[in-house]
């Protein structure tokens, strides 16, 4: 399959103001098979960010107290610390159904509050059908 078959054309992307390429040579992707490997790599990358760097994320269930490695920090502390260092932290988290229905309403709200208190921005997104959800997880 040709590279052009994998990516949208500039017209299909629909954002003529963007100068971001859809592809670049020498890209590297490393599969992280287990959650502990993922969280350890995430912690290393986020801790290396400095003022003016960007951290964008989406989340379905944002447990702010989830530890990224033994002894901490939690995901909330990790992202809040980045915001406190001047990293531009922006998140889009699913605005969960009520906790009474065994969902993650409080956790998602608390993750956003912790990051926003440190200077980041987290929006709760509920653009779904009734009873639906955004099952999304992404960090850039």
Where are these regions (language model features)?
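HKD-type phospholipase D/PLD-like phosphodiesterase module
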Residues: 6-51, 63-140
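Structural motif
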Residues: 54-58
């Amino acid at each position: 399959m040709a590279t052009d078959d994998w990516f949208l054309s500039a017209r299909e992307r629909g954002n003529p103001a963007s100068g971001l390429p859809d592809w670049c040579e020498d890209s590297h992707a490393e599969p992280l098979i287990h959650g502990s490997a993922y969280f350890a790599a995430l912690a290393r990358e986020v801790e290396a960010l400095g003022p003016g760097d960007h951290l964008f994320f989406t989340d379905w269930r944002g447990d702010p107290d989830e530890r990224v490695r033994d002894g901490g920090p939690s995901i909330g502390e990790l992202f809040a610390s980045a915001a406190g260092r001047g990293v531009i932290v922006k998140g889009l988290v699913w605005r969960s159904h009520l906790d009474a229905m065994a969902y993650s309403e409080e956790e998602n709200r608390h993750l956003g509050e912790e990051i926003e208190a440190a200077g980041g921005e987290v929006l709760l997104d509920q653009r779904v059908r009734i009873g639906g959800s955004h099952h999304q997880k992404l960090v850039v």
